[in-house]
């Protein structure tokens, strides 16, 4: 997929090993199916092993010194740190994404998510913010609206994916630790936020997604936010492929 090129930065928002139905997505009008894996069926040891495989592959297909952002909830802090041990050269920072509104929950409703920032391998990493001398004043508390904040586009985001990340949040992370033209890799594409953010910041995006539904979701979101047309490897447009596959289903052909 990468054509032999190594990614300059990773932004990963993988599953948190919690159910989507009744936990992340409520019982209202907008409902979502479960992710392909890691939706509560894994033990702590199994989830740690799952995360370690992800991280090892991220390290394998990225440049030395690259910065890797991994999103996670507070309940799985131990698993993600244990998974990273021995894979990454350094645990650079723990970022708190502070949202406008709290999500579901009973004993203190959660109004934040965590982003674990690691450095892969030796070598110098990219730091475009420093101490603010470049005009980018950055701390480890990031305040961005969550998907449930009342705003323009809220309904579309909630309908597209149960855990949509804020586009500006990901774009700022990309601006922090990569340069124009760099390749940004997302191993869990989901709603396609990283691809859209890479485009808007002058980078190139590459992403992996297991669920065909969210492959389509990510491509549609990228096209909508960028004005680009998605082209299949065989030269057909996204709409043409969709029309062909619909026709195949209707005629009973695989």
Regions found by a protein language model. Give the residues of each.
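Core catalytic lobe of class I
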Residues: 1-215, 253-254
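S-adenosyl-L-methionine
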Residues: 1, 219-254
């Amino acid at each position: 997929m990468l054509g032999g090129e190594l990614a300059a930065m990773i932004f990963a928002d993988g599953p948190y090993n919690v159910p989507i139905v009744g936990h992340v997505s409520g019982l209202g009008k907008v409902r979502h199916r479960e992710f392909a894996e890691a939706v509560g069926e894994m033990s702590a040891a199994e989830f740690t092993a799952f995360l370690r495989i992800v991280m090892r592959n991220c390290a394998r297909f990225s440049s030395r010194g690259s910065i890797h952002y991994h999103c996670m909830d507070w309940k799985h802090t131990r698993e993600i740190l244990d998974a990273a041990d021995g894979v990454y050269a350094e645990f650079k920072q723990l970022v708190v994404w502070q949202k406008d509104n709290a999500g579901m929950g009973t004993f203190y409703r959660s109004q934040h998510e965590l982003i674990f920032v690691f450095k892969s391998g030796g070598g110098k990493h990219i730091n475009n913010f420093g101490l603010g001398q470049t005009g980018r004043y950055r701390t480890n508390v990031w305040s961005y609206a969550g998907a449930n904040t009342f705003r323009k586009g809220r309904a579309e985001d909630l309908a597209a994916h149960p855990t949509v990340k804020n586009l500006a949040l990901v774009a700022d992370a990309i601006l922090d630790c990569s340069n124009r033209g760099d390749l940004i890799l997302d191993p869990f594409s989901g709603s396609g936020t990283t691809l859209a953010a890479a485009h808007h910041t002058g980078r190139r995006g590459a992403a992996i997604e297991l669920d065909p539904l969210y492959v389509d979701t990510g491509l549609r979101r990228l096209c909508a936010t960028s004005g680009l047309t998605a082209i299949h490897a065989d030269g057909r447009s996204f709409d043409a492929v969709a029309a062909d596959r619909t026709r195949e289903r209707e005629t009973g052909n695989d």
